[in-house]
């Protein structure tokens, strides 16, 4: 059309040149985040936050600048995993994320509360708005890989993240129980419906390895992950054993010291993508 400014958002005309309106939120002007990886699970109790923490530490050990955006607003655990308890501070440009001594940056609702045990009793739209602000109002600085720790399920927060953040990939955390396969399928299908690429699966609690004889015991039953991976044509990025040491380090706020060798292959694959 003659006289078209190219700004479709301020134009009321209907024409063939109209571009679809983007729902992506603008990052903070002090942020330079190269890749955003969402970590999701179809249900709770599969160790998603543990896997998120391990991936961030693994990427950091590979020499990348990493960050975690804790989008699990009503059940945040990332700050405690890294021993971060002090409230964050702000600047003229926005909020400054907490940072571990090793350099992993973290933003979580718990870092804004006067007391980390205070409950967050918000409805879905308010929670979604807070997560979006963690992207727009936080000065992340230079970050090579940002991992977004999403709450379980396929609700409002996942929708907000997939629509508002430039998600480059999704890692789906699962466990060997048969029920999980059905629920994980929902997460894969949602990502694909929203044109968000899925990197693959990480199976947690895959087995327990006896420290004496080395025998692997499938405590939660035989895994069906290979069937699921074949069904969706997705790779299995890692199978993580039950590791009491990892659980202890998470509770003690020392995840930066954890042995992350089990997820290093997954981190290396993502780095090559």
Provide a role label for each language-model segment.
Residues 33, 44, 70, 78, ...:
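Residue-level signature of catalytic and energy-coupling elements of molecular machines
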Residues 1-23, 188-273:
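C-terminal lobe/tail of nucleotide-utilizing enzymes
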Residues 107, 150, 163, 199, ...:
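Glycine-rich phosphate-binding loops of nucleotide-dependent enzymes
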Residues 35-73, 188, 194:
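Walker A/P-loop phosphate-binding motif and the immediately C-terminal alpha-helix
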Residues 28-34:
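Phosphate-binding P-loop
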Residues 113-161:
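Phosphate-binding/switch loop-helix module in NTP-utilizing enzymes
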Residues 141-148, 154, 166-187:
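Conserved Switch II/interswitch segment of TRAFAC-class P-loop GTPases
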